[in-house]
Amino acid sequence: MNREFVEYLSERTKHTLAVATILHTQGSTPRKAGTSMIVHPDGSIFGTIGGGRAENEIRLSAVDSLSKKETHRRIQVILDDDVAVKEGMVCGGQMDVWIETQNV
């Protein structure tokens, strides 16, 4: 976790948000394990874990997790399907992502 990330969290009080962190990658991916981003219930984010369709899929999953009041969720994002190729995201890898709800 970098300094900006910690400062961002410390400036928020009485907020519920999700932290999405890449646990593991396989093949070519835009970001590697350990990269995190914050997702708010309204879908706004702080940070990035790769951009594009993959990041949007993770963002939507985090918003869903928050709305269901889950404590955590693990998802896998595959970056080599037809949609990814059409959007120019031809990394060809996959990311395992941990989404954890935080009350700060």
Which residues does each predicted region cover?
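Segments forming oxygen-rich coordination pockets for charged ligands
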Residues: 1-104
